[in-house]
Amino acid sequence: MARIAGVDIPREKRVEIALTYIFGIGPSRATQILLSTGINPNLRVRELTDVQVSLLREEIEQKYQVEGDLRRFENINIKRLMDIGCLRGRRHRLGLPVRGQRTRTNARTRRGGRKTVAGKKKAAAKK
């Protein structure tokens, strides 16, 4: 397995697909990286030479913010929103959808599993 940006890249996959295993690199950015390095996107990772792997590693580390740095950057931005007390920050703090989605129904992913609420007790049957 090739190791790029602290991630083990799967050997059997095409390079274009394998690069997307790195947080911060999607399909379009993977294609862009391969074009700039001149590596064939249809090659399997196991077919890459050491020179090509080091070329990919240098390209990614120099030009892109990936993995831990990117996660840290995102967390800092969310923390900043919470600190200034804007609506987006409050929604993050409360664990609710941030981008204006409805919450009367749906929003289960963001709000978590359903909480069981006790129903009204039925009136005792008259005898």
From Swiss-Prot:
GO terms for cellular component: cytosol; small ribosomal subunit. The keyword Electron transport does not apply. One of its GO terms (biological process) is translation. InterPro entries: Rbsml_uS13_C, Ribosomal_uS13, Ribosomal_uS13-like_H2TH, Ribosomal_uS13_bac-type, Ribosomal_uS13_CS. One of its GO terms (molecular function) is structural constituent of ribosome. Keywords: Ribonucleoprotein, Ribosomal protein, RNA-binding, rRNA-binding, tRNA-binding. Residues 97-127 are annotated as: Disordered. NCBIfam families: uS13_bact. Located at the top of the head of the 30S subunit, it contacts several helices of the 16S rRNA. In the 70S ribosome it contacts the 23S rRNA (bridge B1a) and protein L5 of the 50S subunit (bridge B1b), connecting the 2 subunits; these bridges are implicated in subunit movement. Contacts the tRNAs in the A and P-sites. Belongs to the universal ribosomal protein uS13 family. Part of the 30S ribosomal subunit. Forms a loose heterodimer with protein S19. Forms two bridges to the 50S subunit in the 70S ribosome. This is Small ribosomal subunit protein uS13.
